[in-house]
């Protein structure tokens, strides 16, 4: 099984943070966060888009189990998934924004292609 980054958080906090980050990303089309969080969120967001491309009821229920808002799931299935119907992965891109003032953490913008 694939190794996940721990992000310096307890398991429940990390899972909740990633679910919220992916939900926000799918809702707005882009999100600004640290590079390690963006890499983890990108993995899950791409899995959610791939599931949405299937478009069946089971895929919708699997996405609903991870994404926290029903409106975002509807948007994912109705608008985002058809946009990537002919693309096999690589739905996101990351732009480095440089170090964050205050703690120097490397910040990136994660966005849909």
From Swiss-Prot:
SUPFAM superfamilies: Prokaryotic ribosomal protein L17. One of its GO terms (biological process) is translation. InterPro entries: Ribosomal_bL17 (IPR000456), Ribosomal_bL17_sf (IPR036373). Coiled coil: none annotated. The keyword Chaperone does not apply. It comes from the Bacteria. HAMAP family: Ribosomal_bL17. This is Large ribosomal subunit protein bL17. The lineage of its organism: Bacteria, Bacillati, Bacillota, Clostridia, Eubacteriales.
